[in-house]
Amino acid sequence: MPYPKHIVCASTAVLNDKNEILLLKSPKRGWEIPGGQVEEGEAIPTGAIRETKEETGIDIEIIKYCGLYQNVSRCICTHLFLGKPVGGQFTTSIESLEVGYFSIEEALRMVTWKNLKERILHCLDEENHPFMVTF
């Protein structure tokens, strides 16, 4: 039997002290929370912190593990966290055309991909952590 090959990703819903959420505008998916692939030899929370820094310029602290989204057909497992900013300044990259903090209500209007919007809602629903969503 061949070894399974899964892509492991990590994303973070970063909330500032005004309860605004950090979003970036991806050229592929539009507005979303920061995240991406965990590198070989990297801890999953460390990957979430690194991806947030790379995509937004913001340094974060992980507050809580929220849950898992598994895309079965594409073999992608995305771990989701809640985080808070601890430093840094907004920067953009090839992965992020724009970066900013937005009210939860505004963010949910801005995020157009249903799956990405659901991830935010699941992360904010702390009573139901941890969650696992397969699709």
Model feature map: region roles:
Residues 1-21:
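Conserved N-terminal beta-strand and adjoining loop/helix that marks the start
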Residues 8, 34, 95:
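Exposed loop/turn and edge beta-strand positions of beta-sandwich/beta-sheet ligand-binding modules
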Residues 14-15, 23, 83, 101:
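Conserved hydrophobic "DFG−1" position in protein kinase catalytic cores
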Residues 15-20, 28-30, 72-74, 85-89:
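Short, charged/polar surface micro-motifs in flexible loops or helix N-caps
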Residues 16-54:
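Conserved Nudix-box catalytic region and its N-terminal flanking loop in Nudix hydrolases
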Residues 38-61, 71-123, 135:
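Unchanged
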Residues 63-67:
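Conserved S-adenosyl-L-methionine
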